[in-house]
UniProtKB/Swiss-Prot annotation:
Zn(2+) 1 binds at residues 72, 105, 165. The active site is at residues 74, 139. The gene is dapE. This is Probable succinyl-diaminopimelate desuccinylase. Coiled coil: none annotated. Its EC number is 3.5.1.18.
Amino acid sequence: MTVLSEQDKIRLLADIVKIQTENDHEIEVCEYLKDLLSQYDIDSKIVKVNDSRANLVAEIGSGAPVLAISGHMDVVDAGDHDDWTFPPFELTDKDGKLFGRGTTDMKGGLMAMVIAMIELKQSNALKQGTIRLLATTGEETEQYGAQLLADEGYLDDVSGLIIGEPTSNIAYYAHKGSMSCVVTAKGKAAHSSMPHLGTNAVDILVDFVNEMKQEYKNIKEHDKVHELDAVPMIEKHLHRKIGEEESHIYSGFVMLNSVFNGGKQVNSVPHKATAKYNVRTVPEYDSTFVKDLFEKVIRHVGENYLTVDIPSSHDPVASDRDNPLIQNITRIAPNYVHEDIVVSALIGTTDASSFLGTNENNVDFAVFGPGESIMAHQVDEFIRKDMYLSYIDVYKDVFKAYLEK
């Protein structure tokens, strides 16, 4: 039973695209969704982070198993609106595409999940189990919305979790983690004409960076067996086969020194320098390994001068490659998207890191949502209209099939 027309489904997406949630104000989407769901007798609860940022939790059905479905409400900055062909916060329907900030990443996926819930509720299609919607704040920054929901127990009883990020018709059973590490070197300032009276923080930090580069090289020489296989994702996006060495990068541990700052002016010995690293963790080389590695190199180079801070750390999430969610997606989705579904690990990260940690409870897990991932964060972001609409039906069938397993 279809409750909403095609025009209704597009209008609902337009309504939440109009709400400007550039790294803030998700509570307005929460209030909109709460009102929408109440029209169909679906109870929901707003879980606040602060006055302007909040999550929304809603449920249909009852009892076990519990399937959590999740999407984030925040979007990245739209930049200069003059660079857009169409206004970024007005949904524009043109040439089979729905343009607007967040259409792909990921208000399209979120609204597809919400509509799927509504239509399942109205048709009394759920014979057993619970669908729990977790609409989150702050995914594009530090995942504090997802972490709050995890801390308050909303994931404690779940059997499965689907994240509706845009996946280009790829079903992800796992993804890498991500860490930000900031190394600071503190020396002693002096005039450049008398450098021996100071301690050059840049020199110290360069020594650290060079030694860490060698450590990373040594790690990659042994990083040959991977629990997470990201090769199918990469080969689909690149439209070519990749070699063994490339596969060890995509499926393995990755560390990048992306920022280096030191010194204030040319005629002074720099007293402070900082290097920032982004680290993509995997089960074989996790956050504990990374912390120990940084501390080891600091001890060797100069622990009296160097410190490390880790402002963010999100674990890799792994599940069985053929878990029941993945099985249902690969069986059902081709009927609607008219292509086979590739199964892969994801090289990025999602709210699942905060929801599940390292997934010690072996929750069935999938990242699968409408939209082409390459469109995320782009000027003139769009989602194909047919993809958005078809995923509503995909979700309905997948949710129902999973709960009836």
